[in-house]
Amino acid sequence: MTKLRLTDPNLSNDDNQHWLTFVALLQDAIAQDLHLPLLQLMLTPDERTALGTRVRIIEELMRGELSQRELKNQLGAGIATITRGSNSLKAAPPQLKSWLEAQLLANKSS
């Protein structure tokens, strides 16, 4: 199995450190069942809605039954948002894609 990259090449060293601090905080919050209040504290309602939409975009892109334009119309998301999701999915490590497929598509009908 390929080792996953811990840092984001699109972020500065400082921003990567801040991101990893947040990820560690979230992991601790999950372990203590505090993840929902933490995310509500850290994210605005619009940001939480946007994350939910991004999950749906990734799910539908992986399902592969709708064009990006159809997906835009169904979800009410901008075409640029869907294109970014598509490009991110293409660049994702294979083990993440497999995990997402199991989490998002297994035992779900369209």
Swiss-Prot record:
Pfam families: Trp_repressor (PF01371). SUPFAM superfamilies: TrpR-like (SSF48295). Its main location: cytoplasm. The keyword Transport does not apply. Transmembrane segments: none annotated. Keywords: Cytoplasm, DNA-binding, Repressor, Transcription, Transcription regulation. One of its GO terms (biological process) is negative regulation of DNA-templated transcription. Residues 68-91 bind DNA. It is found in: Cytoplasm. One of its GO terms (cellular component) is cytoplasm. The keyword DNA-binding applies. It comes from the Bacteria. GO terms for molecular function: DNA-binding transcription factor activity; sequence-specific DNA binding. Belongs to the TrpR family. Homodimer. This protein is an aporepressor. When complexed with L-tryptophan it binds the operator region of the trp operon (5'-ACTAGT-'3') and prevents the initiation of transcription. The complex also regulates trp repressor biosynthesis by binding to its regulatory region. This is Trp operon repressor. It comes from Yersinia enterocolitica serotype O:8 / biotype 1B (strain NCTC 13174 / 8081). The lineage of its organism: Bacteria, Pseudomonadati, Pseudomonadota, Gammaproteobacteria, Enterobacterales.
